[in-house]
């Protein structure tokens, strides 16, 4: 995975409910695992912006509810600092669903804004995003 140019805070623990930013059919998902997280015994794994996570669909199309998908965190409420000194935060926590580990998006468009750090690490998501902040 490509490194990103920001000091990211991991603020989304396992069990967090997240909105879905794309048009894949899911509306709300639950975070169940963070890929590549190296933590301590008995400590919940946490995710930050542009992290690859595993989610379970909780609300959306009836045929998708309960299914497990890989996703990327594209927005986070907790503010983080960029290398130029600016701080950025969004009004909700959101993910974009993926078809595979390589970053192929399940949806065809992301109408809401995504972070620049996501576009750096996941170029296929940047292609379908309308707004990159």
From Swiss-Prot:
Coiled-coil annotated spans: none
Gene Ontology CC entries for this record: cytosolic large ribosomal subunit
Keyword Lipid metabolism carried by entry: no
Cited CDD domains: Ribosomal_uL14
Pfam families: Ribosomal_L14
GO molecular function: large ribosomal subunit rRNA binding; structural constituent of ribosome
This protein's UniProt keywords: Ribonucleoprotein, Ribosomal protein, RNA-binding, rRNA-binding
SMART domains the record matches: Ribosomal_L14
Gene3D superfamilies for this protein: Ribosomal protein L14
InterPro entries: Ribosomal_uL14 (IPR000218), Ribosomal_uL14_arc (IPR019971), Ribosomal_uL14_sf (IPR036853)
GO biological process: translation
Membership in a protein family: Belongs to the universal ribosomal protein uL14 family.
Purpose: Binds to 23S rRNA. Forms part of two intersubunit bridges in the 70S ribosome.
Subunit and partners: Part of the 50S ribosomal subunit. Forms a cluster with proteins L3 and L24e, part of which may contact the 16S rRNA in 2 intersubunit bridges.
Protein name: Large ribosomal subunit protein uL14
Record organism: Nanoarchaeum equitans (strain Kin4-M)
Gene: rpl14
């Amino acid at each position: 995975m490509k490194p990103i140019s920001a000091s990211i805070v991991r603020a989304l623990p396992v069990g967090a409910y997240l909105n879905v930013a794309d048009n894949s059919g899911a509306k709300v998902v639950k975070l169940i695992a963070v890929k590549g997280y190296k933590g301590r015994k008995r400590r919940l794994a946490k995710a930050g912006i542009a992290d690859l996570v595993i989610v379970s669909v909780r609300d959306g199309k009836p045929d998708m509810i309960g299914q497990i998908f890989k996703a990327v965190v594209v927005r986070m409420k907790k503010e983080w600092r960029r290398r130029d000194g600016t701080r950025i935060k969004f009004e909700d926590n959101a993910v974009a669903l993926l078809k595979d580990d390589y970053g192929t998006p399940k949806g065809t468009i992301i109408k809401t804004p995504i972070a620049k750090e996501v576009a750096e690490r996941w170029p296929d998501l940047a292609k379908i995003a309308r707004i990159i902040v």
